[in-house]
Amino acid sequence: MLKNTEFVDKLRTSGLRPTKQRLKICEVLFNRDKTFHFTINDLAKSISEHLNEKISLATVYNTVHAFKNKGYLKEISINSDKSYFDTNTTIHHHFFDEDTNELID
C-alpha cells in the first residue's frame, strides 16, 4: 500500500498538483490489493460513502481524466455514453456483461 507522501511525489512528478481531493481519490483508487473497474459515478459514490468526503462529481471527473492522460488509468468505452476506467493499465482484454453491466478482465 502506498503512503500519502508517495502519492504527493507521484502527482508532482507527473505535473499534477497534489490537492486534498486528488489525494483522497488516489487513496480510493490505488490503495487496494487488486486492480478494479469503475465508472466516475461509482467512484464518487465510493468516496462519499467510505471516506465520508464531499468531492464534487466535476472534480472526480476531471481528476480521473487527468490520471488517465498521465497513464495511471485506462478508459474502456462501452458505448457513446458509458465508460469504465481500469486501474490495471497493462494490455489485456475486457468482456462486458450487458445483463449485469459488469466489466470483466
Set out the residue ranges of the language-model regions:
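Short alpha-helical segments that sit at the start of domains
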Residues: M1-C26
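Short capping segments at the starts of secondary-structure elements
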Residues: K20, R32-F38
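Short amphipathic alpha-helical elements of helix-turn-helix/winged-helix folds
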Residues: E27-R32, S46
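Basic amphipathic alpha-helical segments that dock to polyanions
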Residues: V60-K70
